Design a protein with these regions (language model features):
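Acidic-basic catalytic patches of nuclease active cores, encompassing PD-(D/E)XK
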Residues: 411-444
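Metal-dependent nuclease catalytic cores in nucleic-acid-processing enzymes
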Residues: 177-184, 337-345, 433-437, 481-501
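Mg2+/Mn2+-dependent nuclease catalytic core
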Residues: 168-172, 471-488
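Active-site metal-binding core of divalent-cation-utilizing nuclease and nuclease-like domains
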Residues: 137-142, 433-461
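Conserved catalytic cores of phosphodiester-cleaving nucleases, focusing on short active-site segments
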Residues: 432, 456-471, 485
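Domain-level recognition of nuclease-like catalytic cores that cleave nucleotide substrates
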Residues: 490, 496-520
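Structural motif
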Residues: 147, 463-465, 499
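Phosphate-binding site recognition
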Residues: 1-424
Length: 520
């Protein structure tokens, strides 16, 4: 059996991973490809915790000429020169949750670290002048062009992307910092910036007009994350060990990992890509869990969903032109660019004839995690009790006990305070949609039939449920509509037993008053 290496969970430094003999999925062929493409300025957008920082660190070691670190990797057979260049490496990851003055001091500290390395004792005042001085000094002292690596360039802006007041202020600070990258072009060998989102009005996009955005290029689709091929080859022994610990066959283990963490695609022709953070955590802890979602609350995303009044049921499958989602996030007219660039929806298909992309939630981890985050909007802030209730409902529904599940939900709703917008049928429809999505079942709303729309369809492994929801009426009225409009006929070929569920909600109590269940 091949050597089982320890997992580099939370370690983003290439040199440390190699020297400690930790697991490294070889991405060095991409490093060679990019550095020998003839281009000079590159930008890559990927979701958080997707390997961007490790990739930047890999470029750093490569440009520092540390050939010994790349022994046995793809680039060892490709690169012949191993020329050492001066490298300026900046990470903006620590620049979050800051006001203008704090951000300016943060940038000053990052510049001071580099100035100390290059012996600059009397720096200029403004950040852009200091960056120019750094590039000039490194160029003059070494006689070689300078490499500039900027990781998480947009980190200071993510928290204010929804703010019309703070975003322009902080964006101007960052524009000032990045502006020398154009003027210093003759002194630069390679510039690489990574981030989550695309901000058009930063100088790196509006002034540095020759930057190459590789974020949706087919040839770089697998540059971050772990492809299915890499999982089954470079991590084959890890899959076998995890399968043994979880008492599954190799095929069952691969399918479970795929269901939880696979499903990302970043180009029209993209391999299947797994979330690396969750995959490594699952293997290190021998447990499938919601690691990526638990590592950061997407508060800015939740704020944007509210701003654009996006219903939970609208987050799923849709078709879009590339310009609708691979677009700048400031001034956006929909939440789609932020959803895509942040990793909450991804490419699921591409039609070359229409040039339309199909977008959807990548996998179970994101689907369940996202709807859990939205749950407090519908059932109050007691998420612990809410999660417990939903877990018990899940067990009941698996046993086809919808009556018991409705009793459980009714009892819980009686304990929560008033929720905003709870006086419309749509509120309760979306609440039910969120709950059933968390249960990891197929669920859809406003499903068309020849005679009307079914409020909600729920499909489990064993049954198909058709829900009709009423407000301030009764369950009999809901059931009467299902039968009168013959909704079940639309689903006769589903191959599953059909169960009709009529539910009535009361505006005054914000709860279920009654329900009726009939088997077709």
């Amino acid at each position: 059996m091949a050597e089982l290496k320890l997992y580099p969970v939370g370690i983003q430094t290439f040199e440390e991973i190699i020297t400690r003999n930790l697991l490294y999925v070889d991405k060095t062929e991409y490093v060679y490809r990019m550095t020998h493409s003839g281009g000079k300025h590159f930008f890559l957008s990927r979701p958080r915790r997707f390997g961007k920082s490790l990739l930047v660190s890999t470029f750093k070691s490569y440009f520092q000429g540390k050939k010994e670190l790349f022994k046995g990797l793809a680039i060892e057979k490709l690169e012949n020169e191993w020329t050492e260049y001066p490298v300026l490496h900046f990470s903006m990851a620590g620049g979050k949750h800051m006001e203008k003055d704090q951000l300016e001091r943060y940038l000053g500290s990052r510049l001071a670290e580099q100035e100390k390395v290059w012996g600059i004792t009397s720096p200029a005042v403004d950040a852009n002048d200091r960056l120019i001085s750094l590039i000039q000094t490194a160029y003059e002292k070494t006689g070689k062009q300078v490499v500039v690596l900027i990781d998480e360039y947009d980190a200071p802006l993510l928290d204010v992307v929804h703010s019309d007041v703070n975003l322009p202020v902080l964006r101007n600070v960052m524009r000032n910092f990045y502006s020398p990258l154009k003027d210093c072009e003759p002194m630069l060998r390679f510039v690489f910036l990574t981030g989550i989102t695309k901000f058009s009005q930063l100088s790196i996009f509006s002034e540095l007009n020759n930057i190459t955005n590789i974020s949706m290029d087919d040839e770089y689709a697998g540059i971050c994350g772990i492809t299915r091929e890499e999982l089954e080859t470079q991590m084959s022994v890890n899959v076998d060990v995890l399968a043994e610990k979880m008492d599954k066959s190799r095929e069952q283990m691969l399918e479970s990992l795929r269901e939880f963490y696979d499903g990302y695609h970043f180009a029209a022709q993209s391999p299947d890509i797994f979330n690396p953070y969750s995959l490594l955590n699952a293997m290190a802890k021998s447990k499938l869990d919601y690691y990526w979602f638990s590592s950061g609350t997407p508060t800015y995303l939740i704020e944007m969903l509210k701003k654009f009044q996006v219903m939970p049921s609208e987050i799923g499958s849709c078709e879009a032109d590339q310009s609708e989602f691979d677009a700048p996030t400031e001034g956006m007219s929909s939440v789609m660019p932020l959803m895509y660039q942040s990793g909450y929806i991804t490419i699921k298909g591409y039609d070359p004839e229409t040039e339309l992309y199909t977008l959807d939630i990548p996998n179970k981890e994101i689907r369940v995690g996202l709807y859990r985050s939205l749950l407090p909007n519908y059932i109050g802030m007691n998420t612990v009790k809410g999660t417990t209730t939903i877990a018990k409902m899940s067990a009941l529904i698996r046993r086809n006990d919808m009556d018991g599940a409705m009793q459980m939900l009714q009892a819980y709703l009686a304990t929560i305070p008033y929720c905003n917008n709870a006086d419309s049928e749509g509120h309760y429809q979306q609440m039910m949609y969120v709950i059933f999505s968390i249960l990891d079942n197929y669920v859809d709303v406003e499903v068309r039939t020849p005679s009307g729309r079914v409020d909600m369809v729920l499909r489990t492994a064993t049954h198909l449920y058709l829900f009709e929801l009423k407000l301030n009426k009764d369950a009999d009225a809901a059931m009467k509509q299902i039968n009168l409009k013959e909704y079940p006929k639309r689903f006769a070929l589903s191959g599953l037993p059909i169960v009709k569920v009529g539910v009535n909600f009361d505006v005054a109590t914000h709860n279920i008053t009654d329900w009726k269940i009939e088997h077709e």
